[in-house]
Amino acid sequence: MKFYSVKMRASLNDRHVSGGERITTEESIQKVVSELLTRPKEFDFVNIKIEKINNIKFIEKSLDIKTINVKNHKEGNEIALKLLEEVGIDREIAKAYIDLLHTGANPDRENMRGAMIITRSGKRVEKDRYRGVRTTNVDFLHREEVKKILLEKKYTERTLDALALSTKNLNHLDIIAEYCISDQPDYTTGYVAVNNTYYRINPLKEYSNPKGGRIYFVKDDTDIEELYKYLQEESFLIKEVGSLE
């Protein structure tokens, strides 16, 4: 079976406003393109890129999902720090970079386009502090079935996409954990991915805060060139969804 990567990027007044990507079969390309084009509410430029995938790899099962509801974002981040501490991430190191993410992680104190990469010892090692690194080329093999399962459990398509990304991330042996908050001011749910589990924490950031992004915590001896290649170039389909709580 042939698989294709379909990527959409939309902008308004030269500012990125929406994006999405899927891996699909040749027969479903037109349907997927139509679905992606419904994502941006307003735009003056949209780019669709369709590319054949020559080497597709498979992950048997996604991370499990656990939802944690808390009173406020401070309590949510306390839980996040404890989860990170459990896998050997120093609390003060984690807190410093999480605080930075909540206030703007690029040199201009705005949002980065991709993720920060932080080693266990606290070094910040992504190649570009404006661009960061983006995880791409991952989807569910039976996306519509998994989407239906998640929606029945009151999750969203946003969760579906984030679960796919975090599953690919933690599939890499050098990625210890991931921390993520949205850059949308009215979306306060975030997650920590660690120990084969996607901990969905609500809320993880303060309402009306426009800052957001991702942090990938990695081992000290991580080969950064290889990691970039894995995250940005290697293509994966996830066969099944993990357990849901």
From Swiss-Prot:
Group of enzyme by EC: ligase
UniProt subunit comment: Homodimer.
Family stated for the protein in its record: Belongs to the BioW family.
Top-rank taxon: Bacteria
Classification of source organism: Bacteria, Pseudomonadati, Aquificota, Aquificia, Aquificales
EC id: 6.2.1.14
Cofactor(s) needed by this chain: Mg(2+)
Cross-referenced Pfam families: BioW
Keywords: ATP-binding, Biotin biosynthesis, Ligase, Magnesium, Nucleotide-binding
Catalytic activity field: heptanedioate + ATP + CoA = 6-carboxyhexanoyl-CoA + AMP + diphosphate
Gene: bioW
Listed InterPro entries: BioW
GO molecular function, one term: ATP binding
Annotated protein name in UniProt: 6-carboxyhexanoate--CoA ligase
Metabolic or biological pathway, per its Swiss-Prot or TrEMBL entry: Metabolic intermediate metabolism; pimeloyl-CoA biosynthesis; pimeloyl-CoA from pimelate: step 1/1
General function of this protein: Catalyzes the transformation of pimelate into pimeloyl-CoA with concomitant hydrolysis of ATP to AMP.
GO BP annotations, alphabetical order: biotin biosynthetic process
